[in-house]
Amino acid sequence: MLTVDDVLEQVGEFGWFQKQTFLILCLLSAAFAPIYVGIVFLAFTPDHRCRSPGVAELSRRCGWSLAEELNYTVPGPGPESQCLRYEVDWNQSTLGCLDPLASLATNGSPLPLGPCEQGWVYDTPGSSIVTEFNLVCDDSWKVDLFQSCVNLGFFLGSLGVGYIADRFGRKVCLLATTLTCASLGVLTAVAPDYTSLLIFRLLQGLVSKGSWTAGYTLITEFVGLGYRRTVAILYQMAFTVGLVLLSGLAYILPHWRWLQLAVSLPIFLLLFRFWFVPESPRWLLSQKRNTEAIKIMDHIAQKNGKLPPADLKMLSLEEDVTEKLSPSFIDLFRTPNLRKYTFILMYLWFTSSVVYQGLIMHVGATGGNLYLDFLYSALVEFPAGFIILVTIDRFGRRYPLATSNLAAGLACFLMIFIPHDLPWLNIMVACVGRMGITIVFQMVCLVNAELFPTFIRNLGMMVCSSLCDLGGVLTPFLVFRLMEVWQGSPLILFAALGLVAGGMTLLLPETKGVTLPETIEDAENLQRKAKPKENKIYLQVQTSELNTQAAERDASQGTAQQK
């Protein structure tokens, strides 16, 4: 029986059509990077001190350098220098230029300190939401809330957007979420106050991850089996390209509103090209829209300069006797193997997020060059993608994924015992952990897409990856609260999560060389060592034997297994 993969073998598994579509969708993947980690530049916190009226004039009159001004007018080092000020009238004429506060101190008692009632002075040539809305000192938690809103949006949007993609199609989801994401990005850039900023970021989080995931699912369903893993990994590496470009763009545009506009407006241009990207033929077949699927397969053949199979058009004339498959959350937990896949993938996504972001927070707390530090951390992800491309065909998915989890967990465990006077060793081990968890992040997307049947593939991706977003919401609190107990406490948590994830990965089936499952039965059979042609996505109808088995099963259970 003819399958989608059989047709692609004849018309081109990765021809001109797939290459063109892949490059377009990679632009979407790169555009998602500023939404996910743009907080680094949008909300950076520069050195700051209380604004005290009269200090600037006194400094000019006395000819002080910046270091002298800070020494004379700002309280000692630590939080006091950023959140408190001397309660002194700096405009009084009796103040001298040499130790001006000496004459005000009586009996050697310290001068009274007060809050920053006049705002703050920030040592930066640019701006961020921190400097514009004064999100420092008692209001510093609002920066964490700003980032949590994005991750909360990812989490909430995972469920609804995933259902839309499986119910109404990948293309409809892609167009709707991309348009909404771009519009909300522009609204964020012109937000008049902090409250509206939170609302726009939350709403953008609701749709932006769905847009990225719809593109990921679409491109993996367009290509043949031999190229599926390659395009999946390269699609994620396009995200890393977005990280690199973001660091350069942020350096050129140090003002957050201009930077936000610069990363949002180009998304509108992608919409014009997305309009000409066809719907996934695999999804159309799962919805029993065979005629449309065959037209798209014929279009792919024409674009690739190949002739479609001679029996392709005959398939649309055969009677469609199968039942239309509609996505349901229950399907993710309906059968034993699918239930196991869902829970394990949820844990893997959660672990990936906590360890990935946690390592950045724990190691990246050193005050270096913001742009270079971000660039170096992004470049580490390119070797991770290369390692996947080299190993995934030789060793499959399961063992590299398990090994990467174990490597990340072991690296975090070793960092606990590295002395503080060996920072270079700490950075090297941390890079190994970062590379390992990056490999996990990239591979779990591929494995997630390969384990679920077509009609719930996008839903399965969104539901499982929603745990990644939940981890993103919790990670700042986990890291900083545990560091208050002991600086190495977060590393113990990261090590435990990574090592357990490595063991749980071995419970998943190997999907190397196995075609994408169409039905729940196909997904259940992945656990068995099936022949290469056993699990296929059919262009026409399922065999009468499967229909008979399904009818007998439905009759015995009293309910339909699938809508």
From Swiss-Prot:
Topological domain ranges for the Extracellular compartment: 43-144, 193-196, 254-257, 364-371, 419-423, 481-487
Bilayer topology term: Multi-pass membrane protein
Modified residues (Phosphoserine): S328
Reaction catalysis annotation: 1-methylnicotinamide(out) = 1-methylnicotinamide(in); dopamine(out) = dopamine(in); serotonin(out) = serotonin(in); (R)-adrenaline(out) = (R)-adrenaline(in)
InterPro entries: MFS_dom, MFS_sugar_transport-like, MFS_trans_sf, Orgcat_transp/SVOP, Sugar_transporter_CS
Residue ranges annotated as motif Proline-rich sequence: 278-282
Residues in compartment: Cytoplasmic: 1-21, 166-171, 220-232, 279-342, 393-398, 447-459, 509-563
Function: Electrogenic voltage-dependent transporter that mediates the transport of a variety of organic cations such as endogenous bioactive amines, cationic drugs and xenobiotics. Functions as a pH- and Na(+)-independent, bidirectional transporter. Cation cellular uptake or release is driven by the electrochemical potential (i.e. membrane potential and concentration gradient) and substrate selectivity. Hydrophobicity is a major requirement for recognition in polyvalent substrates and inhibitors.
Protein name: Solute carrier family 22 member 1
Gene this protein is translated from: SLC22A1
